[in-house]
Amino acid sequence: MARCRHHSGYLADDEAAHGTYVARLPKKHLLPEMRPTCKLGRVPHLPSMNRYSERQGHQQNLRRPRAFGGFLDFLTEGQVLDSLQTVVEQATECVATMKTEAGVPLVDVQDRVEVPNSRHRSRGRPSINTVHRHRARPTLCAGHPNNYPSCSSSMSDSHSSVTAGWLGSRSQDSDLGARGVGSLPPMRDKLLLEKNLKRLLRLESKGKVLNQHCSQRDSLLWDSLGSQSSSQPTREQPLSWFSGLLASTSVTPETSELGLGEQEMIFLKQELNKEIKSLLNQPTSFNLPTYCPLREPHRTLDFLSEHHLFPALQRVVSQAVDKLSHACRHNGFPLFPVTSELSPVFPGNSDLQPSSKASLPTDREARGETCYSPTSASSPKTSHRKSKDRRGSPSNAVQMATRFRLKVTPTEVSNVPIPSSQCMLKSPNSDLKLQKQTTASNHNHIPQPRHGLHLTLPAPGITVEVASCQGQLRGQVQHSLATPCHLHSHFPFPVFSPFLPLGKSFSTSPPTLCPEVSSRAGLEVLEGHLKGRGCFTHHF
């Protein structure tokens, strides 16, 4: 037990470990002999190597236990604290001269006894007067047991023990030193906190100066973003003293425990804050006009109309609607089922495309309809009924509308006798077979390749052919042969004369050839040439 006690080098540790005995204290008659050695800076007590003496001292301590205050008295009377103070001053001087890579002192040492209330902080070793005053009046430092070295420890052991005690946690030494009673300097943690506080105050004052001119302009933006005000220190400023040594990285120690996704989000948020700050520091970014909800839509519409962007937007929307209307699900059913297929209207198109406004009749055409129909085939009652049907059912007119195609090619003169119009009027329901045979024989005797004027109507299986001739008329012809052609050129669905039976063929001879016509104007011109003279064939 004695070996462990002397080997540890700390009487306080031995005192705490062995509660049945008290550490052996030197006798009074040894104190006068030890005083000269104390002046030389040597530790007075040496460990005893005699086991008998150790055993005898141990038994003596068991008989007469002494208080721990006797050891403190020994430290005070033997001026052991003086040597401790010297060691601490040397360590303090070494630490005070240490600097970082940036050239900044690592710690700031303050002599609180010399200048207790002054703002000026002295760096380095305390003055000689302070040291002598402390040595002349040594005081007790009540702290942790490890702060007191044993008499058996050497100079290096005492230095290490003092350093270990000085670098420990906060104790009453700093409080006593703050009141000017103790001789030890304040703890390292307190010094570093004070230095960090001074650095933060300096950064805060610098930030106030920099952000003072921007606080009024970006107050609305920062309030909307929910950020902190410019008077408060930013979160990016580190709160630990070693962050200055590590270039003051903005990543806090808590981020190392977070996941990769959270770290990435924090990094992106910091980058966004930097970008916002850089934009706010630019004076040109605040020259933009303020947003007014009552004025901005008007400006947007003006911009679109000035640059003719409405047709482009309409095309884009139409394409999007087209794609969505034809979109299908995984099972093949349409994504948006539509009962009536109505395509968007494109005005300004000369071609009579499906579901276009150009294919719908107008009042002018309805008025011109009576002018071109001299017979009873298109009476006012009939035209009124047709126009009423057109206006009443716009969806049917849209569905029936299609593209007109006309082709004209000359054919050979036929010698078929032409029946009179009176016979046609008297017997409107003549034999259909005879007329079909006559038409077939006429087609068989054409020596040249036959080309015709084809008028494709929206109803399935309906075709109107107009073939040119140079002779007499073929088939049964009425006086109002031009009426069906005129009606076809104006209406998107076929209109026939009540005197013309379905399935009949009729022909006239136009004077000139007309190319393919796809517009309403072309049909009207063609009608003028074919009026009264032409070959029309209507098939179901």
From Swiss-Prot:
Residues 79-102 form a coiled coil. Residues 347-400 are annotated as: Disordered. One of its GO terms (cellular component) is centrosome. InterPro entries: DUF4702. Its main location: cytoplasm. Residues 350-359, 372-381 have a biased composition (Polar residues). The modification Phosphoserine is found at S393. This is Coiled-coil domain-containing protein 116. It comes from Rattus norvegicus (Rat).
